[in-house]
Structure formats: C-alpha cells, structure tokens
UniProtKB/Swiss-Prot annotation:
GO terms for biological process: chaperone cofactor-dependent protein refolding; protein refolding. Residues 579-592 have a biased composition (Low complexity). Keywords: ATP-binding, Chaperone, Nucleotide-binding, Phosphoprotein, Stress response. Residues 579-607 are annotated as: Disordered. Acts as a chaperone. It comes from Fusobacterium nucleatum subsp. nucleatum (strain ATCC 25586 / DSM 15643 / BCRC 10681 / CIP 101130 / JCM 8532 / KCTC 2640 / LMG 13131 / VPI 4355). This is Chaperone protein DnaK. It comes from the Bacteria.
Amino acid sequence: MSKIIGIDLGTTNSCVAVMEGGSATIIPNSEGARTTPSVVNIKDNGEVVVGEIAKRQAVTNPTSTVSSIKTHMGSDYKVEIFGKKYTPQEISAKTLQKLKKDAEAYLGEEVKEAVITVPAYFTDSQRQATKDAGTIAGLDVKRIINEPTAAALAYGLEKKKEEKVLVFDLGGGTFDVSVLEISDGVIEVISTAGNNHLGGDDFDNEIINWLVAEFKKETGIDLSNDKMAYQRLKDAAEKAKKELSTLMETSISLPFITMDATGPKHLEMKLTRAKFNDLTKHLVEATQGPTKTALKDASLEANQIDEILLVGGSTRIPAVQEWVENFFGKKPNKGINPDEVVAAGAAIQGGVLMGDVKDVLLLDVTPLSLGIETLGGVFTKMIEKNTTIPVKKSQVYSTAVDNQPAVTINVLQGERSRATDNHKLGEFNLEGIPAAPRGVPQIEVTFDIDANGIVHVSAKDLGTGKENKVTISGSSNLSKEEIERMTKEAEAHAEEDKKFQELVEARNKADQLISATEKTLKENPDKVSEEDKKNIEAAIEELKKVKDGDDKSAIDSAMEKLSQASHKFAEELYKEVQAQAQAQQQAGANAGSDKKDEDVAEAEVVD
C-alpha cells in the first residue's frame, strides 16, 4: 500500500513529509532543500519550472513567473502567460506535481494520495479550490486539514498531559490563530480566527514601497512600473526582512537597477530593524484582533494558555515574537521548525488515515457560522462557528406565502443577523411544491460539512419527497474587509442586530395575525356582528399599513389593536365550540354510552 504524503501548500514556500518509523520525516526536494518556493515559471515552449530555479530566474522573466498564487485561491482570478490563461488551481497544481515527484524519488514508489493543509480561515470555495489543485496534480486528496491544527498534531503527538495550546500561524499570505486542547492523544480545536490577506508578503511590500519612495526622492525615477526592477526589489526586500530577524541593520545593494539619459543608476540603501519595525507596525497590530477573538471564543484569558506555538516563516520577525511574548506573558515555544511543522502534521494525519498512527483523534472546527436567509432578510444560523466537524444538521422550514410553487435556498456564511451583511456562498432552488396555504409545506434543509470543511447543502419537500442539493463552491473569496466585518463588527453591531431581529419577528407576527384573522373571518361570517367586523377589518388595514415599516412600536401597537378588536369574535367562537362539546357529552350520556371519556372536541385556535 502506497504512503499518504502530507503537504503544506504555502503562499511563499511549500513542504512535503511522510510517516517513517512512527514519526514524520520531511522529504528534501531534488535540489536538496527541505522546503520548495511556491514559484512557477512557464516558458514559451510550455516547459514548466517550479521552486528555487523558477524563483532565481524571476528577475529576467517576471511576466512568465507566478508567485503567491495561494492568495487568489477560490477566486475567478486568472494569470495570462504567453497568451494562455491559468487559474490559481492550475498554477498550484504545478507546485504540487513537483512535491509529488520529489516524494516519489525519495520513497522509490508511486505516490497517489495526500493530505493537504489550508489556513484555518479559508472559506469553503478556497478549500474546494485547494482540493481541485490536488486532483489536477494527480493526487487523491484524502483530507484537507487546517494548518494550525496540523502544527498542533505534530507538536502534540507524544503529549500525555492536558494542555491548552494556542497556535499563532503567520505565513507568507495568511494569518490564523487557533486555540486547542491536547490531552492523551485527543487534539480538539476550541476556536479559530484569522485573516486570509495578512502575511509575509505584506511585510515585504512595506520594504518595497519604502525603497521605491526613497529611490524616487533621490533620483526622480519611479521603479514601481518597471517589472524587471520590481522583481529585483521584491527579492531584495524578502532577503532584507530575513536578515533583520538576526541583524540590527542590513544593506540593500542593487547595481544597475535602472537607467536614464545620464546613464545607469544603482540602488544602495541601509535598513535598520527599528525602521523596519516602524514600517510594519500596523501589520503586527493587525494580528492582535484575531488573537483576542480566538481567546474570547474559547472563553479563556491569555494567562490560561499553557503553550504558544509559532508557525509560519513570518513568526521569525522579532517584533511579532515580542508582541506575542508581551501579550501572553510567556515565551513562545521555539522547539519546532515553523516552516516544516505543518507538513509534518499533515503527514501524521496521513498516518492516522492509513492506520499507522493510532490513539490520535483530531477534532477540527468550522471557522464561521453557516445558515440560510429566511423571511424578512434574516440570517438563520444552522451551524454555529467553532462547531466540531464533520457535522450534519437539519431544520424544517415552510413557505412564506400561499400557493408558493418554489423556494430559493440562499446559503450564507458569517456572524451577522441581517442576511445581506454576511458572505453569500451560493443559492439553489427547490421547485414543484404543491399548492398549499403558507406555513403548510414542510421543507427540510440539511447542512453537511465533511471532514475537509467543505459544505454540502440539500433541501427536501417532506410532502412530495422532491430534493435538490448543492456542493458549495463559490467563485469569490473573502476580502480583508469582509473578514473584519464578520469577526469584529458582529460584536460592535450586536445591539443593532438585536433590534433588526426583533423588528423582523414583529413583522412576521403581524403577517401571521393578519392571515389567521382574515381566514377565520372568511370561514365564520355568521358568527361576527357587522360592527365587530368593521372594527376588525379597520384594525387589519391599520396593521397592513405599518407592518412593513421600521417602527417596531407602531407594529406592536397595531397588533394589540387587532387583538383587542378580535376578542369578542374569538369569545363567541369558543362559546359555540364549548356548547357543541357539552351537547355531544350530554347526548352520549343520554344514550348510556360508557365511552364518553374518549370523545375529543376539535377546534381551530385563533390567537
């Protein structure tokens, strides 16, 4: 049986590992390195070069070299090279193909199966895109697991005592924080938070922007529009960032960076760690919000965390380590390699799936709440965020109007009460619902999140058995603003959301009251006086005028008036029902029946 390899498909670098002799082994690539740059170059003859070689020649071939494609996973972005357009999945597949080939050379056998990691805050469409990339690369992706969880898996394999662990994962393009409980082989994710658009690339870009601005100040030349010069700046910025993790100052030297009428120009600058910290201060601060959110969702204080694991190459930045240490009051664990631990964890999960690793149970969670849009534009959550996966939940809903022939299931992801404030994953229709009064048809909606975190939604008419289902694979990922809105604004807008929820509930109650009252009037015209009927109809009209407005107190007041106007009518109906029941009981007694206790009086209750 062939091995299941573990792959960390990173924004900047990727890594592959496999279980050997009960532990995870990092597989070196064909160049002898333990990580492979996630860089792809495609030549005009179709030849593909991946990794360090592609990265080295990016300066001379910037338009045919692609890096950091992971930031576009799950979107409709395409990169055009020599007239051909490539999706992020296709480019990522080329990196995966190299990792697969290197693993086969190391193991001496064909590799067909893999566990691939993704950021914990990846959306459903981004997870699906990652799985698709694996398929394109010729891999059967047995499981998609979250990067922080994989890191904890590698860290916690031998741990027997109970610990609360926080994984701080700052990679090349994404940031995740996960809080986990590790105890006797069980690794349970309690909460997760993050930002899909924050990582090492952003730190590089700050250096690039500074270099461009300083060079323009000195020479008047703008390097940002020169693709070849920009690629050299990018390489120099990444190198300077890495050097400043150990040095207090670094020199950036780029001879012949450009030229003008006076001749060639050279870029020579010094960058201190203090200046770098100043340039990137806002990026370090951007990690604080998700960290606090993850702790809050786990109902823990910073001092209750037993161990902090730093994952991702960007956690080597001194300012990041300093903030983590100051916030938690303890030094983070530096005993793990931040570039390799995720791939090692993925390999361990592969071992679990093969049965080679026993007594390890991984319980992961979904990062955002999932649900559907219901009457009044409300987001009705069916699966709350931080719910352990895999999970399957069903809920029965009904139609909003009489004789409704179809329902549209609008699938959403987020934390806000108003449907439009959340991220839309997709929608589908369930048609052919038999004509019936509102509230009568029973539509069962089922959400099923598999172990990969991929969402499957179905809707079934319980009356006819008709069913429609969809695997959500949306075409757009969450922007930084959308993520911040979902995680931070939910709390800031809590009162606003509560008021909106109450308003929608009042509108729905008003609709129900109008419908029920009109129906009862129609069915019992001889049981209401002309005066009462006029009062009831006037109250109905008044409620209809205000029910779709934004004034909840006006709706409540109009409902109360309608209820008061209907009281006498309702009393008359109940009196008649009771009289009929008594008459039936009396008739039974007169007949000498001994089954009078079994008689049931049926009546329609009108609120």
